[in-house]
Amino acid sequence: MTTINLKDSFKAYDVRGIVGETITHETVRATGAAFVDVLGLAGQTVLVGGDMRPSSPEFMDAFAEGATARGANVQKIGLISTDVLYFACGIENAAGVTFTASHNPAEYNGMKMAKAGAVPVSSETGLFDIRDLAQKYLDEGSIPTVENPGVVTEKDVLKAYAEYLRKLVDLSNIRPLKVVVDAGNGMGGKTTPAVLGDALLPALPLEIVPLYFELDGTFPNHPANPLEPANLVDLQKAVVEHGADIGLAFDGDADRCFVIDEKGNAVTPSAITALVAEREIARAKAEGNEQPVIIYNLITSKAVPELVEKLGGRAVKTRVGHSFIKAVMAEESGIFGGEHSAHYYFKDFFNADTGMLAAMHVLAALGGGNQTLSEISASYSPYVASGEINSEIEDKAAAVDRVRAHYAGAPVEVEDSDGTTFTNTEEGWWANLRPSNTEPFLRLNLEAPDTPTMERVRDEILALVRQ
């Protein structure tokens, strides 16, 4: 009998818990069994991989025990980034799981799951059903074994992943570039040499300067979360010191990628979204797609939909969160999607997100001409953004109401979708207030035509929120 409640570790999109407390050998084994039962995978192959966290190998074994007991064959694909799992699930048309807690601290681990074709498993597509059945197995103290349990095999998919990405974006003929890559001791330390280096494939015209490529799930240098500006400082310094053309920072499971220009300044994910959208629209039109669809979330710069429409594409706005983007990508036949959090989704990558492929598009744009990255990104960044500002506040609804009351009667449109968005059409600014689902935070994102307007509106709204 167990006292662990799986509701503590099963979130809306994935599983995350503290090793030995809310995620253990037993909970993972039960989850492996429930994964097979709920998704009907008996007799089929389930892919199992994991990141560099110390507990990942044991958890991969535990999941395999549960999955094979219920009749699935397990193919272990070893040490992988999360986008390698999506690639393998897509190319092999098989369901799978990877053990990672992304950028969470060292004491955490977790699971990201996908159905065949890299379709995400979330609370709305079976994750909570898996949780409930796993809880039943835990409470009963045993997992029934089928008459013909599955077998475990191993396969390395990293070279196939690297070849696949190189076919999507050809970097072989770009001008030579010096690229500093901060892997943050995460899985980018393994995928970067495979895709951009010469570890598995012929060398590209890229000189890679590695930062923190040693796989180490204790993150000895800095947290592997490039969304926090403090974690980009080492990369920014290195880009300037080495006279590099560009810097890339990956998070722990290497599905997100942040970009630094040659001056050491961060390039916003909105600018990267616009850059990649322009390249993908041109390619889709050349292939006969008359109005390619680009997906963006409501916190992305309005420069993105403006550019997409100017190029003859169609821009579709969605809520924040990868399951929403992936669902809309499929529904709308989108060719590319971008989020302010540096998640980038590609139709050619099974509608899944891959920071590496986005980085390759940036390298192709940079290496295909003579402009610097700061010059290129400036053309995609006509507006001034506040970045995401958190206010710790208990009564979030009352705070939003104060802002709503303040702008009543002004030329401000109010839209209640994924928080509340205020748009001033006369002054050309918009602001979104969105409550965090997991923390007592109200998040402000704001964009304006110039810095004085952005700062004035930002200070106005924060004063109302925090009073």
Give residue ranges: language-model regions.
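An N-terminal, well-structured beta->alpha segment
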Residues: 1-65, 69-71, 151-177
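N-terminal small/polar loop signature for handling phosphorylated ligands or for N-terminal nucleophile
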Residues: 42-109, 195-260
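Short glycine-rich phosphate-binding loop at a beta-alpha junction
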Residues: 43-51, 178-181, 292-298, 335
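Glycine-rich phosphate-binding loop
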Residues: 94-108, 113, 239-261, 265-266, ...
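Gly/Ser/Thr-enriched, mixed-charge loops and adjacent short helices
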Residues: 109-242
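Gly/Ser/Thr-rich active-site loops/lids in small-molecule metabolic enzymes
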Residues: 200, 210-212, 265-284, 322, ...
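Phosphate-binding and adjacent anionic-ligand microenvironments
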Residues: 246, 286-467
